[in-house]
Amino acid sequence: MSQAQPLLVRMMNTNIVIQILIGIIAGVALATLAPNLAISAGLFGELFVSALKAVAPILVFILVAASIANQKRGQNSNMKPVIVLYLVGTFCASLTAVVMSFLFPTTLTLVIDAATNTAPEGIVEVINTLLFKIIDNPINALMTGNFIGILGWAVALGLGLHSASDATKKIFVDLSNCISAIVTVVIRFAPIGIFGLVSHTFAETGFAVLAGYSHLLAVLLGSMAFIALIVNPLIVYIRTRRNPYPLVFLCLRESGVTAFFTRSSAANIPVNMALCERLNLHKDTYSVSIPLGATINMAGAAITITVLTLAAVNTAGVEVDLATALLLSLVAAVSACGASGVAGGSLLLIPLACSLFGISNDIAMQVVAIGFIIGVVQDSAETALNSSTDVLFTTAACRKADNPYKPLVQPTN
């Protein structure tokens, strides 16, 4: 026992990214050697994702309310530059996807059953859904994980608490510290959770089904990689005039890896919050910008909508001029910002974009169905890009405001 305990302590003290990599390797090995057992191990992944999703709504609500309630008058929260970075990044992603689709055009064989979910009829419906989510019942918003509604009520409560006594404000600060401590414990189980997710995915789905869509996946993943490694660093450099790559790789490693396997921006909010705290960012900023980013910062979704829409266009033999392609970029960017307000996310916004080219809903929904088939990779990569960019742009805005000469990466531990 005396020998086992130090080993356990050493394992717990190992960098969590290394632990996650070990979990990934172990998951692949288990799925290869014992597929049935690997499917059962998926329980660990489901528990981990459920725990993250359970703690995320209350974490966002308490942190945002406490942050706004305790904000001093005239204090700069850096939210405006963060939002600008979110919108610019999403539009650049959509433009990149258009260029990649023109350089490497994709056609599809539409011989599968159409997806059965109902897609939104237009951009007005998407905006309408988002507006109604803002005024959702606060209890229902917390229960259903409606982060737009949670943000709205948390901001309203925080503003209302401006005139409260210091003792009342202190209660919310203490509550936010308690919730943050719970999140820290949940995140420590990430290696086990990701082990379960990888085991289940490899054992149940495999990647043989993806071979037929290799070109489509290459365009999607290539576009996302270009945004993550070229465009986003360029945006950060223009904003800060400092080397962006240490921060880029940190965000991809510590936020993107977890998001890739959880496939949920909402579930990754606690992970991003913890990373922002390690980077010593302003709590007033990241407590709002991270959950907001999970809602509107959707570079990956913009790429998915654009690439699959142009694949449908190529398949239907429709000619696309430059003006229409630019319009598609704008529609995809705006639609992507509303992806969190649509059941099925970015995929079910594809028919909306296809309507620009007169493509029938039947064909568009078959493209959506292909999206679900490749979702094991597409959705994972999309979420990793979306979620890691939340931390990237939040850090860039905070560092620019703090000191323009300090390096971007300054973790406290």
Curated annotation (Swiss-Prot):
<keyword id="KW-1003">Cell membrane</keyword>
<dbReference type="InterPro" id="IPR023025">
    <property type="entry name" value="Ser_Thr_transp_SstT"/>
</dbReference>
<comment type="similarity">
    <text>Belongs to the dicarboxylate/amino acid:cation symporter (DAACS) (TC 2.A.23) family.</text>
</comment>
<dbReference type="Pfam" id="PF00375">
    <property type="entry name" value="SDF"/>
</dbReference>
<protein>
    <recommendedName>
        <fullName>Serine/threonine transporter SstT</fullName>
    </recommendedName>
</protein>
<feature type="transmembrane region" description="Helical">
    <location>
        <begin position="357"/>
        <end position="377"/>
    </location>
</feature>
<comment type="function">
    <text>Involved in the import of serine and threonine into the cell, with the concomitant import of sodium (symport system).</text>
</comment>
<feature type="transmembrane region" description="Helical">
    <location>
        <begin position="216"/>
        <end position="236"/>
    </location>
</feature>
<dbReference type="GO" id="GO:0032329">
    <property type="term" value="P:serine transport"/>
</dbReference>
<dbReference type="GO" id="GO:0005886">
    <property type="term" value="C:plasma membrane"/>
</dbReference>
<dbReference type="InterPro" id="IPR036458">
    <property type="entry name" value="Na:dicarbo_symporter_sf"/>
</dbReference>
<keyword id="KW-0472">Membrane</keyword>
<feature type="transmembrane region" description="Helical">
    <location>
        <begin position="290"/>
        <end position="310"/>
    </location>
</feature>
<keyword id="KW-0813">Transport</keyword>
<keyword id="KW-0029">Amino-acid transport</keyword>
<dbReference type="InterPro" id="IPR001991">
    <property type="entry name" value="Na-dicarboxylate_symporter"/>
</dbReference>
<keyword id="KW-0812">Transmembrane</keyword>
<feature type="transmembrane region" description="Helical">
    <location>
        <begin position="15"/>
        <end position="35"/>
    </location>
</feature>
<feature type="transmembrane region" description="Helical">
    <location>
        <begin position="330"/>
        <end position="350"/>
    </location>
</feature>
<dbReference type="GO" id="GO:0015826">
    <property type="term" value="P:threonine transport"/>
</dbReference>
<feature type="transmembrane region" description="Helical">
    <location>
        <begin position="48"/>
        <end position="68"/>
    </location>
</feature>
<feature type="transmembrane region" description="Helical">
    <location>
        <begin position="178"/>
        <end position="198"/>
    </location>
</feature>
<feature type="transmembrane region" description="Helical">
    <location>
        <begin position="141"/>
        <end position="161"/>
    </location>
</feature>
<keyword id="KW-0769">Symport</keyword>
<feature type="transmembrane region" description="Helical">
    <location>
        <begin position="82"/>
        <end position="102"/>
    </location>
</feature>
<dbReference type="GO" id="GO:0005295">
    <property type="term" value="F:neutral L-amino acid:sodium symporter activity"/>
</dbReference>
<keyword id="KW-1133">Transmembrane helix</keyword>
<keyword id="KW-0997">Cell inner membrane</keyword>
